[in-house]
């Protein structure tokens, strides 16, 4: 049984009401519930945290190493374009991660085109709405299964 951690950055607590044209009508609670059910059905454990505070996300990443978290799914939200500290935390714990964005950041304002995470992530999923989280979970589970196979 693997343990996966889902991290949601700033303002994602407002999903469902915040700019639904960009982010959709699905709430964060619905996303977490869907992911938790899918992980459990596959025999795995899922943890999650949403925070508007960078240091809380960093502290949670640090704790993940000591808890034996096997994979991280992260939507850094606005921290995508600003947070070297979050990037450094992810690199420091050496837990593979997938970067997720609800909207297609490349179709938005130019300042949203740069990510401090994409070049060190296992993969990036953007622009697919809440389905992006499901696809990221499926990919993480596939990778964990492949890595568990004897070579």
Swiss-Prot record:
Its EC number is 4.2.1.10. The keyword Lyase applies. The active site is at 23 (proton acceptor), 101 (proton donor). GO terms for molecular function: 3-dehydroquinate dehydratase activity. It comes from the Bacteria. It catalyses: 3-dehydroquinate = 3-dehydroshikimate + H2O. It holds the Pfam family DHquinase_II. Keywords: Amino-acid biosynthesis, Aromatic amino acid biosynthesis, Lyase. Belongs to the type-II 3-dehydroquinase family. Homododecamer. This is 3-dehydroquinate dehydratase 1. It comes from Pseudomonas putida (strain ATCC 47054 / DSM 6125 / CFBP 8728 / NCIMB 11950 / KT2440).
